[in-house]
Amino acid sequence: LGGGWGVLASDSCEKHGLVVPSLPQEALDKISRVLPSYWSKGNPVDTVAKFDAATLRTCMETLLELPSIDSVIIAGFGTYSYFADEIPKSPFASKEQTQPFKLVKEVEEEIAKNIAESRIKYEKPILVVTRLTGDESSSVKILKTTGVLPFSTSQRAAKALSKLVQRMRSRESRREAKN
């Protein structure tokens, strides 16, 4: 979701032998239509804290549609719904102060549903990095109940993805050997 998260994820992928490909101009143009002009215009895609479900879905699906993209890591997800639930518990929070958090929670939950739907639609792994991997975040709960496992660090997500790639290559090699 933000630049620092993306750089960490990209570096972790490369460390684990995964390729983070450049994006074709057509994909960059499509993403540029929904992000502010100052976004990084590259991979990793930095959504510059633009937080609405339609924008994030467009970015995610633009990547998933590309034959050169085998998976997507979404980093920096899940904390809004947690804070939306926790802040109202504070004796210092007024109803007016908590209302924006409820709206953001709804957006984040919609994003979680979009991630789950896109994983099925495109049949590509989508890994999510979040500080909250338990059940303390309603959006992370949505992911977990739909088969999207959260990772606590970009390094863990990249390592898991690397192992998945190794497993797929091993299966392909065995299939080819049989033929």
How should each PLM-predicted stretch be described?
Residues 1-100:
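Short glycine-cluster motifs
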Residues 1-20, 85-179:
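Peripheral docking tails and interdomain loops at the edges
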